[in-house]
């Protein structure tokens, strides 16, 4: 059986937000929550549709649209507390603790959850999160990365042409993954919710799109099993950021994937699914 968006689509009212999510797997299995990255047209499904079904053979898998994305509530930057939203989602679904898997922005949220709500987090898995504005040794240039420049441009012009450039900078194997079909899908998703785009750009103009960062110092007292996954060829967030996290989080390990861009869960889906399944099962 191949799971579809409609098969897995759900929604719930939490204390502060209406949250849409996709869910698969037994409700009796350990919970794994997949947190998507930013970008126009991004959703839980768009980021993790190649992972939901394989992981659901072992876990109760939940992939929410975070507030400000997809079918969840639009929010201004000041109201965009994704860690709080994730905890409220657990509460609404009756889940005491979950493994959190976060891509990019979702990885930043996952690290906030681990440091601010550690009692709700069993495992931490990140793919390509930033580590904050501290000086870097290996990252080329300064300021916004090449990928972030393309991403912000796509928010300003969410056309299929812009989305094509975005998918190209997100992936290493453009011929396989940066397809016209994916660009059209992301453009259609972005056009469906123009309020999400304007809220993102407004927040970006006022100090950056990430409303709240984790504390690097707080990572040093983390003792939650942590798996850091990063693409060696990531042009959005350089893998040096995960080296910084590895140095700070004592109970962590790093897997650096060769010939892989910012979407490790897409470009190396089979390996990613094996890594997540093994790590959550055996740690």
Region locations from a protein language model:
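Flexible "cap/lid" loop of the alpha/beta hydrolase fold
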Residues: 115, 122-158
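Conserved alpha/beta-hydrolase catalytic His-Asp/Glu region
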Residues: 156-220
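Catalytic active-site module of serine/aspartate enzymes centered on a nucleophile-bearing elbow/loop
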Residues: 252-283
